[in-house]
Amino acid sequence: MEKLLNELSSENRPAYSVDSDVEIDAQIPENLKRSSGLGLPSITENDLSRHFTNLSRKNYALSTSFYPLGSCTMKYNPLINERVAKNEAFNFIHPYQPGKSMQGVLKIMYELEKDLCEISGMDCFSLQQAAGAHGEFTGLLIIAKYFKSIKQKRTKIIIPDTAHGTNPASAALAGFGTVSLKSESDGSILPEKLKKILTPEIAAVMLTVPNTLGAFEKNIPEISRIVHENGSLLYYDGANLNAVMGIVRPGDMGFDVMHINLHKTFSTPHGGGGPGSGPVGVKEFLEPFLPVPKIESRKSKFVLNYKKPKSIGKLKAFLGNFPVILKAYVYIKSLGAEGLKNVSEWAVLNANYMLARFKDKIDVPAGSRCMHEFVLSPKSLFKNNVKTLDVAKRLLDYGYYAPTIYFPLIVEEAVMLEPTETESKETMDAFIDTLIKIIYEEATQEPQKLKEAPFNTSVRRLNEVEAARNPVLKWKKA
């Protein structure tokens, strides 16, 4: 395991030296001097360079291997996006500049909003949101402000058990209570069941389409009808939009509010905490409630309009995570409408190919067809107290990033896989063969080996319970 910089430090080894004919220490007044040292590591530039190079070699990334993390859309990120984002014309812009001096930036954001409207079927967008959950929160604040404006007190949100995992937290943060809706065995929502819990208190129903089992919600027209008859709104969680671009549009299906994860569907690097971008789209009647400022085109110029009296206000400093916005813009312009449709078709094809190879060997809770991702449940195959966690840890030894496990919560010992459109048949076959080998051979013949895995990583299996209960989050000098 790589040592920390503080552990590599030596008090007797100067990190740098500067020739000077001035005694710098003598120039600082005594009352401004520190009484103790800063505690910064003293390390040579050579050792510092080696330290970070060694750390980089331990990284796992899309540029190194397959990343089948379900519900995360870990697709290849075209390097042309990075080249444009690093252009000095963008990097040297300051977010506090007046709008008239950054017309190019505002034009890109304005055009991206229009592109997202075309892709989604929504009428207006805000690009301010920093992540998907931030987008959910924004959408729910818009819903709350809308009902307040028409003097209706609606305090609850219906969330199916197949919804994206952040939905309940976003609803709570926005001041709503939540009502859970149990899905059917294939992950679908029965309109009759939904109708029974649609009361005057319900502000909205949040749906993830396709859902977290990888199934497309087949009853959306009926669901939309009964939700709107109740006076409620329909929210689309766009976490899985990569499955349906150019095929169906949420706005055409009856959804009133949605968010899109640019960092997932539109190929910007994500993971490790960000940066992300979760733009929010709404139908025309909700446009007045979007966050400020709104980018508008006036007489061939782009302006930032803060004069929106019904707006929920500003939710992020500046105008959003612009580098992510820029990369998504390049991705959309590079592919065009037909290219984006092909992305979704290939994503669904790849997922169904993998599912077809797995379905006769491992239980598939939601059936033999899927959209862009699917969930396996190897519970019935496990003997000797082997768990999904053990299989995931063992995959690391074979050079794979483990898929999403134990989600969705409605599937026991869940393994969630999303290959995306950018993986080859050979890559998928190699992963499938490895996972089957671990479950069918190693879990039966060498269960203890699985329970002790991984063996080839720089950090072995951690005591996750101890780490959660007694976290050590900072270095202390011995």
Swiss-Prot record:
One of its GO terms (cellular component) is cytosol. Its cofactor is pyridoxal 5'-phosphate. Keywords: Oxidoreductase, Pyridoxal phosphate. Gene3D superfamilies: 6.20.440.10, Aspartate Aminotransferase, domain 1, Type I PLP-dependent aspartate aminotransferase-like (Major domain). GO terms for molecular function: glycine binding; glycine dehydrogenase (decarboxylating) activity; pyridoxal phosphate binding. It is an enzyme of class 1 (oxidoreductase). Its EC number is 1.4.4.2. It holds the Pfam family GcvP2_C. The keyword Oxidoreductase applies. InterPro entries: GcvPB, GDC-P_C, GDC-P_N, GDC_P, PyrdxlP-dep_Trfase, PyrdxlP-dep_Trfase_major, PyrdxlP-dep_Trfase_small. The modification N6-(pyridoxal phosphate)lysine is found at K264. It comes from the Bacteria. The keyword Isomerase does not apply. It catalyses: N(6)-[(R)-lipoyl]-L-lysyl-[glycine-cleavage complex H protein] + glycine + H(+) = N(6)-[(R)-S(8)-aminomethyldihydrolipoyl]-L-lysyl-[glycine-cleavage complex H protein] + CO2. GO terms for biological process: glycine decarboxylation via glycine cleavage system. The glycine cleavage system is composed of four proteins: P, T, L and H. In this organism, the P 'protein' is a heterodimer of two subunits. The glycine cleavage system catalyzes the degradation of glycine. The P protein binds the alpha-amino group of glycine through its pyridoxal phosphate cofactor; CO(2) is released and the remaining methylamine moiety is then transferred to the lipoamide cofactor of the H protein. Belongs to the GcvP family. C-terminal subunit subfamily. HAMAP family: GcvPB. This is Probable glycine dehydrogenase (decarboxylating) subunit 2.
